[in-house]
Structure formats: C-alpha cells, structure tokens
A protein has these predicted regions:
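CheY-like receiver
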Residues: 106-108, 115-141
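A short, hydrophobic beta-strand element within the central beta-sheet of small alpha/beta folds
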Residues: 72-84, 95
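Conserved acidic carboxylate
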Residues: 7
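Charged docking surfaces used in two-component/phosphorelay signaling
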Residues: 14-18, 22
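Hydrophobic/aromatic docking surface of two-component receiver
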Residues: 98-100
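Acidic, metal-coordinating helix/loop segments flanking the phosphotransfer/catalytic sites
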Residues: 17, 30-48
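Conserved phosphotransfer microenvironments
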Residues: 51-69
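Conserved phosphotransfer cores of two-component systems
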Residues: 42-44, 67-73
Length: 141
C-alpha cells in the first residue's frame, strides 16, 4: 500500500516509516505540514494518509485531511487525545498514538479493507472508526 505520513516530529515519522516499510508498504513521503503533504500527494498519489492531529505552528490534521480529500486521498488520524467526532466526514478514523508496531500494521490493514469496500472481521483496539454504523458492523455490537 502507498502511504503518505504527515507528522511534524521527525523521530516519530521515521519510526512509523520503518514499521510500514518492514511490513512491505511503500511510504511515498513524509510531510510535516499541509503544503508539503499536498505537494507529495499530487506527485505520488498515495492510497492513504496517516496524519497527526496536531502539527507544528498550530496546523490541524483536520485541515490536512480536508485538503488531501479533495485529491481523493483517504486519511486516518493518529493522536494522543480523543478527537471526539471532529474528523467524521474528513477521515476514516483515528489511532491512539501509542499504537505500537502491531497496532499500526493491523490498523493499516483494516483501513485498506475499508478503502477497498470490504468489512474487516474486527478492529484492533488502537483504531476507532468515525462511521458509527460501520464501527458496529465490524465490532458486532
């Protein structure tokens, strides 16, 4: 899967990149702001973007996801805080930032399934889907 990572903390971005590369994904680029994310997305056409909710200089991951959505790129946030339903309609969902290798990779597979239009068997505990009916279908609750 071709993935764009939008994260302003270089060490965190590199860790995410290494996890994804190790699992056979292709990281098309790492951006630390909206301008760079849009430029990379236009050039590389990623399948999805993983976006930090809070970027440097007060930039919002919501704004980045909205801009990428106009380019046809589906986004998922990662955050340390619960974003409520702020991203509903803009992103598929969010991962808690302390997701670990397995949590990240399992979440990417669920996101891939959702983008492909299939319903995954389950959700990893680190991933929350904004679409409540879909969340219920997946969790069986």
């Amino acid at each position: 899967m071709n993935i764009l990572v939008v994260e302003d903390e270089a060490i965190v971005a590199m860790e995410i990149e290494q996890i994804l590369l190790g699992a056979g994904h292709h990281v098309v680029g790492i951006a630390d702001d909206q301008r760079e994310a849009v430029a990379i997305a236009k050039a590389a056409k990623p399948d999805m973007a993983l976006i930090d909710m809070r970027l440097a200089d007060g930039e919002s991951g919501l704004d980045v996801a909205t801009a990428l959505g106009h380019l046809g790129v589906r986004s998922t946030f990662f955050t340390r805080t619960f974003p409520r339903q702020d991203g509903n309609g803009v992103a598929l969902g969010y991962l808690h930032k302390r997701f670990g290798d397995r949590g990240l990779l399992d979440s990417v597979e669920v996101i891939r399934a959702l983008i492909d239009g299939t319903i995954p068997a389950s959700l990893p505990p680190t991933l929350h889907i904004f679409d409540a009916p879909m969340q219920k279908k997946i969790s069986g609750k």
